[in-house]
C-alpha cells in the first residue's frame, strides 16, 4: 500500500504543467527552464527529486513484541532497526523500478499520530502502552512519557537515521527555559 501511495503521488506530480508554477518550471528554480508546454517529469526522473515514505509507531510495534520497556533490550532494538532497514530497502527497490528517488523520512507527523491512534482505538479498543496514550510515537523517537534526558534520547536514537533515513530525519529534545543555562544546550549540541 505504501508503494501504491507513493507511485500515485509521482503520477499526480507528472500531471503538472510548467504554467502551474512558472518560477519552478519555466524560470529555472529546478535548474532547467522549460517551455510552458514541456513535460515537467523530465525534472524529476533519474532520481532528481524525492518522494518520501514517512512512518510512525515504531515504539508501539516493539512494545507489542517486547513490552513497553524495550529500549534497553538489544534484541528489541535490532528488531526495530531491521524494520527501518526493510523500509529503506523497499524504497531503494522502488527507486530502481521507477527511476525516481524513493526515500524513508523519519520525522514527526503530529496530525496522523493522533488520528491513526484514535481510529485504531475505535477498531481494536484501548490497548495498554499502544492506544491508551491517545497518540502513536513519531518515527524512531524515544517514548516521551519516560522523560529521557537529552543525552539518553540522542544515544538511543542515533542508530536509526543511519539505518534508513535516506530522506532525512528530525531529531528534537524538549528543554525547560534555557535562558539561565545556555551551557546546557551547548553540552547537548557537543554530545550530538
Q: What spans do the regions from the language model cover?
A:
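Long, C-terminal-biased catalytic regions of enzyme "large/alpha" subunits
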Residues: 1-192
